[in-house]
Amino acid sequence: MFIELVHIGFGNILAMNRVIAISPPSSAPIKRIIQESRTKGFLIDMTNGRKTKAVIFTDSGHIVLAALAPETITGRLSISRGGAVKPELVDDKLEL
């Protein structure tokens, strides 16, 4: 199985084949999901103490917090795939 690793800032690397969605943390439902996953022990904070700019949902049910913007992360994914991924905004949500 091929594992695609992408740098998500400050020395943190994420396996992108496990990612379901990337979202900004600004909405109330996303903030609620972050709090619930923190209490259940499914939250992975990769911000290194910086402001959370992206919330990454994985297929294992874990929630990953990143200090890079969703556009930056998908841009790095696009570069690693040779430009094969074209992220676009649909209803203010980033879709691959």
From Swiss-Prot:
<comment type="similarity">
    <text>Belongs to the RemA family.</text>
</comment>
<dbReference type="InterPro" id="IPR007169">
    <property type="entry name" value="RemA-like"/>
</dbReference>
<dbReference type="Pfam" id="PF04025">
    <property type="entry name" value="RemA-like"/>
</dbReference>
<protein>
    <recommendedName>
        <fullName>Putative regulatory protein DehaBAV1_0033</fullName>
    </recommendedName>
</protein>
